């Protein structure tokens, strides 16, 4: 009867040991992966800082509107990296550290398991010794009584450590579930806060880029490229960019203007001829 009880408790202990081993394995993996996730996020922040610097350097070489738009974008993007830094710090404190703490917690539970196993092994050893004593010296009541006393002590110790282990593992399981809920809730909250801020910042950055006046910057570029004859070239470009209707109207205006000028020239020429004829008549009359 006692040996069957020992076997049942051994099976229970193995189950508790498997539970602790399972937590040790998977919490260790989760801790390593979350830590790598945080490191990757920190490296992304560092690369973003380099990108901000390069954008500012490039912006200083560009035309006014493009320069201002890029600098505003860089400012917003730099602001986002401040939020990313906060994300890294929070993930480290709220996710990685609690998982890392389970290394110590699991070690303590293994110590409890070890103490329980030691007590049960002692109990099993005393039971085996009592059975041998009864077989070898069935009539020696003193030796048998002494072996029974040792077994009773070992059983009491094993029962006490087993009860303590059961309570400890029960609390461990309860705390594990609570911690998992807390850790993953913190992870989701931190990520949501960051991405919410990121959406605001990216919206502002997008608006800054869209505000860049392409035409104004293009005129500034052309003026710097053709400082002397920029106006005439610009007129040519504008003329070439007119619609067919505008070009037709312009041609008609030019044609009408030419016809008016031709009529005026002909009229002036006719007037001059008439004046010359009048002068010739006057001279003839005087001679007569």
UniProtKB/Swiss-Prot annotation:
Residues 1-47 form a transit peptide. SUPFAM superfamilies: BAR/IMD domain-like. Residues 271-288 have a biased composition (Acidic residues). Residues 10-220 are annotated as: BAR-like. Signal peptide: none annotated. Keywords: Cell projection, Cilium, Cilium biogenesis/degradation, Coiled coil, Cytoplasm, Cytoskeleton, Differentiation, Flagellum, Membrane, Mitochondrion, Mitochondrion inner membrane, Nucleus, Spermatogenesis, Transit peptide. Its main location: cytoplasm. One of its GO terms (biological process) is spermatogenesis. Residues 107-176 form a coiled coil. The keyword Nucleus applies. It is found in: Cytoplasm; Cytoplasm, Cytoskeleton, Microtubule organizing center, Centrosome, Centriole; Cytoplasm, Cytoskeleton, Cilium basal body; Cell projection, Cilium. One of its GO terms (cellular component) is cilium. It comes from the Eukaryota. It is a peripheral membrane protein. Homodimer (via BAR-like domain). Heterodimer with FAM92B (via BAR-like domains). Interacts (via BAR-like domain) with CBY1; this interaction is required for targeting FAM92A to centriole and cilium basal body. Interacts (via BAR-like domain) with CBY3; both proteins form a ninefold symmetric structure at the flagellar base; are recruited to the annulus in a mutually dependent manner and regulate annulus positionning. Plays a critical role in regulating mitochondrial ultrastructure and function by maintaining the integrity of mitochondrial morphology, particularly the organization of cristae. Preferentially binds to negatively charged phospholipids like cardiolipin and phosphatidylinositol 4,5-bisphosphate enhancing its interaction with mitochondrial membranes. Induces membrane curvature and tubulation, which are critical for maintaining mitochondrial ultrastructure and the organization of cristae. Plays a crucial role in ciliogenesis. May play a role in limb development through its role in ciliogenesis. Belongs to the CIBAR family. This is CBY1-interacting BAR domain-containing protein 1. The lineage of its organism: Eukaryota, Metazoa, Chordata, Craniata, Vertebrata. The gene is CIBAR1.
